[in-house]
Amino acid sequence: MNNEQSLSHTKWECKYHLTWIPKYRKKELYGDLRRYLGEVLRELARRRECEILEGHLMADHAHMLISIPPKYAVSQVVGFIKGKSAIHIAREYFGRKKNFTGQHFWARGYHVSTVGRDEEAVRKYIKEQEREDRRIDQLSLFR
């Protein structure tokens, strides 16, 4: 299966599994905010010519399988997406109308791993992560 994309002089296929958390790992990504944030993240990715191939927002972290053109560093794209999405959240959910500075929605940092032949396994992991977390939580009730 050939999923290569192209720029003017480059053929590429660069996929990454990204994970990051809200500040203090607060469980805030649910309900309306979760739905809204999904749309915002996809739009922000498009602005950097990226495509979110798979994504899932858990209550306390975000998972994303994303295709990023080689002209952008992964850190640039993640910084852009986290920074701009925090501004969107501040304006839409916390009523901030002016410049949003001094407060943070996301924690610093993120986890990234490259995706190659294991793409289907990564997609499955992202899709089933919430169900697995619930199963583990249920098991911990009986300890």
Language model regions located:
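Basic nucleic-acid-binding interfaces
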Residues: 1-143
